[in-house]
Structure formats: C-alpha cells, structure tokens
Amino acid sequence: AGYVAVKKKELYQNNSCRLPLKHIPGEAQVDFGQADFYENGVLHHGFYLNLSFPYSNVGYTQLFKGENQECLFQGLKNIFEHIGGVPYKLWFDNASNIVKLLRNGERKLTDAFLRFKQHYGFEAVFCNPNAGHEKGNVENKVGYHRRNFLVPPPQFEKLEDFNVKLLRL
C-alpha cells in the first residue's frame, strides 16, 4: 500500500469520537408528518403533529388538515391536557410559523408562539438548520405513528373524535 493509504489507516483506525445521547426526563421533541385520511368519505391530504419523549420513548400524535400555527398550538394543547402536564423543554425545527432566523444567525420567536410558550411555561429549543438528526427520536416516532395508526388512510366522521382516539393509543 502507498504512503497515504497507510497513514489514513493509522489515523482513522481508532476513530471513536461519539457523543452519547442522554435525554433528561421531561424533555420532548416536536415534528410534523404527512398523512392522508378520509373524513365523511372525503379524502384529505393532511399532517400529523408528533410529540415524543426521548427518555421514555413515549409519543403522541394529532391529525390535522394543515400544518400551521393553529394546528401546532391545538395539537400541543390536546397532548398537554391528555398527559396532565407540560414538558419543561421542547425541541422544534425552525418552522417559519414559530421562529424567524435573523441574518446574524439569531432567532426571533413569533409573537403568538412567544405567548403560547409563556402561557404553558416551557423552554423552546430549536435545531440547527438542516440538522434533523438533532431530534432523531421524534423523526423515528413520525414513521412509527404513520405505519401503525395512519396506513391505510383512516376513515372517520369527525376529526376531533379521531384525535381523542389517537391520544388513547
């Protein structure tokens, strides 16, 4: 083998630089997924909010016709009421309906999200742009919820009633 190949092997043979993932109880991650569903026989291309607790791997989901601020707030409110509390820290993507990325790299929360956050008393943490792996637990939960609850597309009469059912699953 050539000099470069030998040096690469030397340099990289014992490369065990990893940070262990340790999650503290009470931290949660939030993300949306896409799913089709039938309400009163009408097909909708909707979205489902996912909240997962990495420490315990428990997750909750709520289905909506949109992926806007109102859906985020309603879904989180439903989940908080169901679990009887609020996580002390929530991890989010940099969704434009809750945060603006400023030129200097800082973030500015939207007024409505700031009020929602203050009302429920949680700390909001935002992932770095293009770093979905920073909240990998909820990314996995998005797939789990889709495979187990939303495929084939569910059929129901009232979305609100189906969301109550989803909280009990």
Q: Residue ranges of each PLM-predicted region?
A:
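Acidic/histidine-rich, metal-coordinating catalytic segments
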Residues: 85-105
